[in-house]
Amino acid sequence: MGDADFVRETIQSLNSHAAELGSMYREVMASVKNRTEIPNVKDIFKEMAEASRECDEMLEIYYGDEDPLTPDVRRAIQRVQDQLSNCASAFVAYMAIARLTLG
């Protein structure tokens, strides 16, 4: 596999993680709004861990390399990081609502 193929597959994989996390974020926020349980919490945490790990692997591959991350790869990593942050914020909102509801 050439460098261009590797970059293309990396971007596609990162974009897939970002899309999946975006969908999961909406699910958690729907649970916040409706004050219902999060239906697939283990799957969400698993996806968050996998996405984070893939970003870490990309940074390790390119760290100190003479060819730095391409702008497209950087943007794909940023999309994943944004969605990870969104999911974490949604869980904070969920826990805040749960505390108010139970208390």
Protein language model features and the residues they cover:
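Long, low-complexity or tandemly repetitive, helically biased scaffold regions used
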Residues: 2-103
